[in-house]
A protein has these predicted regions:
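N-terminal presequence-like segments and the immediate start of the first folded domain
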Residues: 5, 16-80, 87-92, 97, ...
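Sec-dependent signal peptide recognition
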Residues: 2-8
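Surface-exposed aromatic
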Residues: 100-102
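Repetitive helical segments and hydrophobic/amphipathic motifs
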Residues: 11-12
Length: 155
């Protein structure tokens, strides 16, 4: 009986001393600020890249390098916001074809149909990104919409 107890204790102590070291793969992390937007001194990055995934900050329909919204209403702002999104993606080795998820925030959700008229010009074909949308108020610069996305980095 003593031998059994000693054997059990030996097994317990031996198993406790075995290293179960888990190696965590180091992730690459990069913060991107476009040269066009840098002079504005905004308190956020245009994108954060973690390994091969790009997380874009929300894009409103501002004209590049300014805090002025594209004139012409919701569709003009939508077009400019998507163009801004496209520029950030392309500067980081990606494209609209690599977008995985889109989130749309709208000042007036009843304008959803007008937004979609512009959106479908950019996201065509069979493989469209997942998308969420919601109505809100108080968007930056008094914008009527803001779009953010997550995309795959190809290059």
């Amino acid at each position: 009986m003593k031998n059994h107890i000693l054997l059990i204790l030996a097994l317990i102590f031996t198993s406790c001393s075995i290293s179960t070291e888990t190696k965590v793969e180091e992730k690459s992390l990069e913060y991107f600020q476009s040269e066009v937007m840098k002079p504005l001194g905004l308190p956020f990055s245009d994108a954060v890249i973690v390994d091969d995934i790009i997380y874009l900050a929300g894009q409103v329909g501002n004209l590049p390098g300014t805090l002025e919204l594209a004139p012409g209403g919701l569709q003009a702002e939508a077009k400019q916001a998507i163009e801004n999104m496209k520029a950030v993606l392309e500067a980081n080795g990606s494209s609209l074809n690599d977008v995985i998820k889109v989130t749309v925030m709208m000042d007036d959700i009843s304008e959803w149909g007008d937004f979609n008229k512009e959106y479908i010009k950019y996201f065509t074909g069979e493989n469209k990104p997942a998308r969420s949308a919601f109505g809100t108020s108080g968007l930056a610069l008094g914008a009527r919409l803001e779009i953010e996305c997550i995309a795959l980095k190809r290059k």
